[in-house]
Amino acid sequence: MKKTVIIITAVALLLSGVQSGAKSRTLGAFIEKVNSSLVSFDYSFSMQTPASKSKMTGKGKVKIQGSSFFLDGNGLEVWCDGTTRWTIDRFSEEALVESVEESSDGFATNPALMISAVDEAFDEVSFGTAKFAGKTVDASSLTPVLKGKSSMDIAGLKLFFKSGTTELVGAEIKLNDGSVSEFSISGLSFSAKGQEKGSFRFDEKTLGNSYVVTDLR
């Protein structure tokens, strides 16, 4: 479940990624829009791991505002109000509850922390053109400021934009174990902030008695 959770929560990472130093005009404009908006999008992904010839695939939807977010994909729901994160597996009837870590080593698996501390999370190392989904796109290549040593930590990130625009169309995430996830983004929308944090908070009373809840707070 751990790798699947990382894949799903990493989707919100597509909205994070900048650095304290200089950045490309495209990335800077995109981040400015993200920081001032309620952002929603749909995604699909494929993940290739070194140990397997087959690919893991999936799809889902995301809604994010500041340090709060909701993700629904591959049978998992992830709710975060900026303080507590719930991961719900409806099929297995399992729930994991965690506090949002404030330490820097939480960046790799905590998209909310990446966004709330966006200036500390990534450095943009290059910006240019690339091929994505058979089309020429603009590509921003980023590396974590604080590189984790775990095999599940993020080694690198690429954000792909429609050529000449700030429209995010996809991303590529590489983990230290050599796994590569490729995301396609659709239905990206920016609306005025305004949702209460409570709307991103999971109501544990909705879980049935059959659920196994692991509380790590």
Briefly describe each language-model feature range.
Residues 48-50, 76, 178:
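Hydrophobic lipid-interacting interfaces of membrane-associated proteins
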Residues 39-45, 56-62, 67-71, 155-157, ...:
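One face of beta-strands
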